[in-house]
A protein has these predicted regions:
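Glycine-rich "substrate-gating" loop/helix at the edge of Rossmann-like oxidoreductase active sites
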Residues: 145, 180-196, 204-205, 220-236, ...
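C-terminal substrate-binding subdomain of Rossmann-fold SDR/epimerase-dehydratase oxidoreductases
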Residues: 208-297
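Residue-level signal for the nucleotide or nucleotide-sugar donor/cofactor binding architecture
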Residues: 60, 91, 99-102, 146, ...
C-alpha cells in the first residue's frame, strides 16, 4: 500500500514511518514542522535506507494537501498531525480547536474527493477523562478534562458519523497512552522544541544537565505516592500498532476502536527513581502545583 502519514516528522509519526517502510509499504509524508523537525525525516531515510516523498504542508491548507493527493495514488491515511500539549490546550483552546478540528475536516474532505476512504486516527486515552477504575477498556464512559482531549473525542465522533453516512469509509480509532523510548538505532527519538511537555524527555534533559531539575506537578493525587500515574508504552510498539491497524482494516468498512498501552501504570516519582538508577545519579526534583487539565491516573 501507499500510505499518507500526516505529522510524519513528529515523535510517533516518524517511528511509524520506519515500521511502515520495514513492512514493505510506500509512504508519503506531510508535516508543517510546527512542533517537529526535518531532521526526523532525514533520520527515517537513514535508518530505513529508503527514500520517500516529504512535503512541508499544513493540513489546514486545502490546496496544498490536495496537490499531494493529485501527485500520489494514496491507499490509506494515518493521521497524526495536530497540536498535542494538555497544558497548552488549556491556555490556548481556540488554537487547539481550530488546528485539530479544522485540519481533520480538511483532510477528510480531500480524502473523499480523491476516493480515499481508509484512515487510522491518532486518538488518545484522554478521551476517557478521569476513569473510576483501571485498567481502562474500550467500552468505558467517555469524557475529557482539557481542550486537547476534547478535540480527540469530538473528532472520534466526527469520524464515526462520517463512516455512518458513507459506508465506504474504514475508520480505526487508536486510543493510546503515554509513548516513551526511542528507535534502537539511537538516531531517532523524542526531540521536542523548547521545554519538553512529556515526562521522559524532561527527565533526560535533567540527567544530561540541560535542565536544572524535574518539575513534578502535584503530589496530592489519590495514588501510591501522591504523584500522577501513567501507562507508558514504547514508541516502537505503538508504531507497530499503527502498521497492524492499517494492514488489517484498510478497505474494510466500519469503525474499529483499540486501546494501545501496557495495562500497568507508573507514578512520576517511580519514573524519576528508575531513571536515576539507570544513569547512576540522583536526579533533583521539585513539587509544583498541579497543572490545569491533569488527572491522577
Amino acid at each position: 500500500m501507499t500510505i499518507l502519514v500526516t505529522g510524519g516528522a513528529g515523535y510517533i509519526g516518524s517511528h511509524t514511518c520506519i515500521e511502515l517502510l520495514s513492512a514493505g509499504h510506500d509512504i508519503v509524508v506531510v508535516d508543517n514542522l510546527c512542533n517537529s523537525s526535518k531532521k526526523a525525516i532525514d533520520a527515517v531515510k537513514k535508518v530505513s535506507g529508503k527514500d520517500f516523498p516529504f512535503y512541508v504542508c499544513d493540513i489546514l491548507d486545502r490546496d496544498a494537501l490536495s496537490s499531494v493527493f493529485d501527485k500520489h495514488k494514496i491507499d490509506a491515511v494515518i493521521h497524526f498531525a495536530g497540536l498535542k500539549a494538555v497544558g497548552e490546550s488549556v491556555e490556548k483552546p481556540l488554537e487547539y480547536y481550530h488546528n485539530n478540528m479544522t485540519g481533520t475536516f480538511t483532510l477528510l474532505d480531500v480524502m473523499r474527493s480523491h476516493g480515499v476512504f481508509s484512515i487510522v486516527f491518532s486518538s488518545s486515552a484522554t478521551v476517557y477523562g478521569s476513569p473510576k477504575t483501571v485498567p481502562i477498556k474500550e467500552d468505558f464512559p467517555l469524557s475529557t478534562t482539557n481542550p486537547y482531549g476534547t478535540t480527540k473525542l469530538m473528532l472520534e465522533r466526527v469520524l464515526t458519523d462520517v463512516q455512518f453516512a458513507d459506508k465506504r469509509f474504514s475508520v480505526v480509532l487508536l486510543r493510546y497512552f503515554n509513548p516513551i523510548g526511542a528507535h534502537k538505532s539511537g538516531t531517532l527519538g523524542e526531540d521536542p522544541k523548547g521545554i519538553p511537555n512529556n515526562l521522559l524527555p524532561y527527565v533526560a534533559q535533567v540527567a544530561v544537565g540541560r535542565l536544572e531539575k524535574v518539575h513534578v506537578f502535584g503530589d496530592k493525587y489519590p495514588t501510591k505516592d501522591g504523584t500522577g500515574v501513567r501507562d507508558y508504552i514504547h514508541v516502537v510498539d505503538l508504531a507497530l500498532g499503527h502498521v497492524k491497524a492499517v494492514e488489517k482494516k484498510a478497505g474494510n468498512p466500519g469503525v474499529y476502536i483499540y486501546n494501545l498501552g501496557t495495562g500497568h501504570g507508573y507514578s512520576v516519582i517511580e519514573i524519576i527513581k528508575a531513571f536515576s538508577k539507570a544513569c547512576g545519579k540522583e536526579l533533583p526534583y521539585v513539587i509544583d502545583p498541579p497543572r490545569a487539565g491533569d488527572i491522577a491516573v
